[in-house]
A protein has these predicted regions:
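Juxtamembrane helix-loop junctions of ABC transporter transmembrane domains
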Residues: 20-28, 52, 59-75, 99-146, ...
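Membrane-integrated ABC transporters
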Residues: 1-60, 75-96, 110-114, 118, ...
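Hydrophobic alpha-helical transmembrane segments of ABC transporter permease domains
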Residues: 32, 51, 106, 110, ...
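An intracellular "coupling" helix at the cytosolic face of ABC transporter transmembrane type-1 domains
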Residues: 40-43, 138-139, 157-164, 168, ...
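Short intracellular "coupling" helices and adjacent cytoplasmic loop segments at the cytosolic face
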Residues: 13-23, 119, 127-151, 155-157, ...
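Helix-loop-helix
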Residues: 77, 184-198, 268, 272-343, ...
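ABC-type nucleotide-binding domain
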Residues: 82, 365-642
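Transmembrane helices of ABC transporter permease
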Residues: 41, 45-58, 62, 99, ...
Length: 642
């Protein structure tokens, strides 16, 4: 049956390919939010990491500065001695080795701690993402390709891993190194420092030009990757349909177009990114060579007291200065890419949760000595609506399963109403069947009962209570639902049945399977109820999956059943077995049924005929046949869509 949902609108080209290049908005705000997530849980770790980064940077600077002393005070004097004493030199080299050892230990500690910080932060982000995802309304998943959502969990989160574990620590280290080296160079020789800074200005100008181009392509790369993942996921789910209609070549063409789009954006992004390091490295080499020539000339000419040790120490500092500038350029691209991923992550996390203003809850209840309903912690088989009032009092109303629609209008989007003035009721124990052409609104009505969507106008009452006053989790707990698309989870058969009520015993699950007439085929499985199901129950037939879905609804023991296409995928023999089981399951419960075959709803207490979102007929099977209206045409004509 068609679902009357808002369609996802994409940009030009397949699935939005070819639209304008996006830009990261508020990068500073995004970075602040990311670091807020890190500091919230790992502030002490970050302080230690910062200390290690400073220690490592200072060790490198000190080693470079000590080179002046090593050359001028040890090596040069030894060249003028006939029998030089190597002991002082070895002591000096040992001192240099200790300085480098401190730097190595600090860098190792920094790396180890950042692994813990990074993985812990990503774990927390994934938990927040998944927790928030479960609070999102159904319409969010209708409007966003599932593969694109998966891409947020995988690709976008991975860009944050690179940024947190490598880019930001390296950026901080580079900044500290640049400042400390600059001060040291100024102390050694201000003239060579000016020469170095002129070359650095050229490096920064070049880097800015390159990163300004690469940033927009990194954002596009993440977007195109999400679209490709969405397409792959969609085609994997629809492989049977693709093969039935022999659309492999068409599907491949769509994949190639999206894949080529990703290739282009990734090529452009990485072309700019990959050129940064070689360009800055070569400019750094030029800076090194110029400083070496100028310094050597000054030392040979004894200009300003320049010594060989000063030149060598300055060249070491020059190398230490140019390297972090090159790294800053590279890490800037990585951070831009990570911010593009972070923007998608936080966009999903900031999507509005499913609104729920309900305050009426469902509780276990029992009758006291005065025959009044009271709340209890024990499972008694009696459920009651707990209704708090403004005056501070609380009343309990037994859950019966009475559903009433009064003047209900609804549209998936505000400008298009798909249900018009729906008035109907289902009393406890009644079976209400919805029939009509595809797109008439049958599935939409059941979506409104469980509040997957909220109505635009009118009222839906459950046991006399406006369902908008009932907390959604409690409302849905009172409903047993067999969805149009049967979905089973990876796990055993028993676990899938128990999904209907997690505290159900094995005996209750088996009883539910028997009620749904699923026990027979389950017993014939290799491991019976302990048989492992593969992805979405792929190792079961369509009918067997449907039977398990019915058993899953049965174990919940709900007062209201919603059976959306419950027997549409079951053969005639299996349908007869299921129908007998369902008749027993529906006894004493309000049941709303949609079925392909009108023969399955002949025994309904009320059949509601829908057309273009309006109720055009209602009554029992015999009454509607006697009217010889739309239902009569559907029933006797055996129309394909029904």
């Amino acid at each position: 049956m068609a679902q009357e949902k808002a369609k996802v609108v994409h940009g030009p080209g397949p699935r939005g390919v070819g639209g304008p290049r996006p830009k990261v908005e508020n990068p500073g705000k995004l970075l602040k939010r990311i670091m807020g997530e890190v500091f919230r849980h790992y502030l002490p770790h970050c302080i230690i990491v910062l200390f290690c980064i400073v220690a490592s940077a200072m060790a490198n600077v000190q080693a470079s500065l000590f080179l002046q002393t090593l050359v001028d005070d040890y090596i040069v004097p030894m060249t003028q001695q006939a029998n030089p004493d190597f002991a002082p030199l070895l002591g000096a080299l040992l001192k240099v080795g200790c300085i480098y050892l401190v730097g190595i230990i600090a860098a190792w500690c920094n790396s180890r701690i950042m692994v813990n910080v990074t993985q812990g932060t990503l774990r927390n982000l994934r938990v927040q993402l998944f927790t928030h995802m479960e609070s999102l309304p159904i319409k969010y998943f209708d409007q966003h390709p599932h593969g694109d959502i998966m891409s947020v969990y995988t690709n976008d989160v991975d860009t944050l891993r690179q940024m947190l574990s490598q880019s930001i620590p390296q950026l901080i280290s580079s900044a500290i190194t640049i400042v400390s080296v600059f001060v040291s160079m100024c102390v050694l020789d201000i003239r060579l420092t000016v020469v170095t800074m002129l070359m650095v200005a050229l490096m920064l100008f070049t880097t800015k030009k390159i990163t300004s181009q690469s940033g927009k392509y990194f954002i596009a790369q993440q977007r195109d990757l999400g679209k490709l993942n969405g397409y792959i996921e969609e085609m994997m789910e629809g492989q049977k349909v693709v093969k039935v209609f022999t659309h492999e070549q068409k599907t491949l063409a769509g994949f190639r177009e999206l894949n080529d789009k990703l290739k282009d954006s990734a090529k452009q992004a990485n072309s700019y990114a990959n050129i940064i390091m070689p360009v800055t490295a070569q400019l750094g080499n030029v800076s090194y060579a110029v400083c070496a020539l100028v310094g050597a000339a000054m030392a040979v000419g004894n200009v300003g007291g320049m010594t060989l040790g000063t030149v060598m120490a300055f060249l070491a500092l020059n190398k230490s200065f140019n390297m972090p500038i090159s790294q800053v350029s590279m890490q800037a691209n990585s951070i831009i890419m990570a911010l593009a991923g972070a923007e998608r992550i936080f966009k999903m996390m900031d999507a509005p949760s499913e609104a729920d203003e309900g305050y009426v809850t469902l509780v276990n209840a029992k009758y006291d000595r005065d025959d009044n309903l009271v709340e209890t912690e024990e499972r008694t088989g009696i459920w009651a609506w707990k209704h708090p009032h403004h005056d501070g009092t609380t009343t309990y109303h037994k859950l019966a399963g009475d559903i009433t629609f009064t003047g209900v209008d609804f549209g998936y989007v505000p400008e298009k109403t798909v249900l018009h003035d729906i008035n109907l009721y289902g009393r406890p124990g009644q079976k209400i069947a919805f029939v009509g052409s595809t797109g008439a609104g049958k599935t939409t009505i059941t979506n409104l009962i469980n509040r997957f969507y909220d109505i635009s106008d009118g009222k839906i009452r459950y046991d006399g209570i406006n369902i908008q006053k009932i907390r959604k989790s409690d409302l849905r707990r009172s409903l047993g639902i067999v969805l149009q698309d049967t979905h089973l989870f990876t796990g055993t058969v028993m676990e899938n049945i128990r999904y209907g009520r997690l505290d159900a015993s094995d005996e209750e699950c088996i009883a539910a399977a028997k009620l749904a007439n699923a026990n027979g085929f389950i017993q014939r499985l290799p491991d019976g109820y302990n048989t492992m199901l593969t992805g979405d129950g792929a190792n079961l037939s369509q009918g067997q999956r449907q039977l398990l879905a019915i058993a899953r609804a049965a174990v919940a023991d709900p007062p209201v059943l919603i059976l959306d296409e419950a027997t549409s995928s079951i053969d005639t023999r299996t349908e007869a077995l299921v129908q007998r089981g369902m008749d027993g399951l529906m006894y004493g419960r309000t049941s709303f049924v949609i079925a392909h075959r009108l023969s399955t709803v002949r025994n309904a207490d009320c059949i509601v005929v829908l057309e273009q979102g309006r109720i055009i007929e209602r009554g029992s099977h015999d009454e509607l046949i006697a009217k010889k209206g739309k239902y009569y045409q559907l029933y006797t004509g055996n129309l394909a869509e029904n």
